[in-house]
Amino acid sequence: IGFAQGGTAINEAFASGQLDVAFVGDIPEIIAKSNGLEVELFANLNSEAEMGIVAGKNSGIKKPADLKGKKVVAAYGTVTYVYLNNLLQANGLSLDDVEVINDIANGGTLVASGNADAVVSTGTGVWQMSHSGVGDILTTSQGDADLSSQFFAMGRTNYLKENKVAAEAIIQALQRAKEYITQNPEKAYEALATSDNPKELYENIYPKESGFDNLDPQIKEEQAERMNSLAKFLLENGTISKDIDAKSAINNEYYEEAGKTFTK
């Protein structure tokens, strides 16, 4: 089932009991736990999901520090806003140093028309925009876990308890996928390719030279620490009203059981 509305719609479906398991980003999970939903993370999908920024060709932006005083498109309360904040801080700036335009759906158009100087997007988004002539890739989070987003498998706690085999089957499938792309990267790129997202895109987002440890289904302790930092940022910005402990939202028991079947 696809959710075009993203994390908000997914959390609403969990709350109403219409959804048992979903693949989500780190922000929806934090919001879900802050709102008291009985859900937990049981597998990692991507611990370093790439984010990036495309700068307009006439924006004068050549390095992240040049974003100061510029109009940057990002969506409040999403991974784009978080990435922008973290990138600015890493370069001695803050969100107060830029004018944020909260219109991510039209980000590419705004930059191409000169009504915005830069736009934040996912790795896929920045690649597509740069290749369609919107602008140039300023920077991405590739190779920097602290600037990257995370994606997980999340399920209703009671459903997972009653359907352990389902959770383990998902983890086993994720493990097989990781093993396949590790052993056959070129074939994996070709299998993922579409007319909109060609093989070259996946070669750039998932470079075989970097390895594929970010696709390991086990949720690591450092991932919980990154989520706790993210939760504090979301609390400070009013996205959530109550802080959470990410470690309490993670359940690796299903991974440990599924791991007994993995090829050593």
Task: Write out the residue ranges for each language-model feature.
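Short polybasic/polar patches that bind polyanions
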Residues: K33, Q89, S130, L235-E236, ...
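Short, hydrophobic secondary-structure boundary micro-motifs
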Residues: L41-F42, L138, Y189-A191, K242-A246
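Solvent-exposed, acidic/flexible segments
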Residues: F3, G7, A22, G60, ...
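Short, glycine-/small- and polar/acidic-enriched structural segments
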Residues: I1-I101, L110, D117-G123, I137-T140, ...
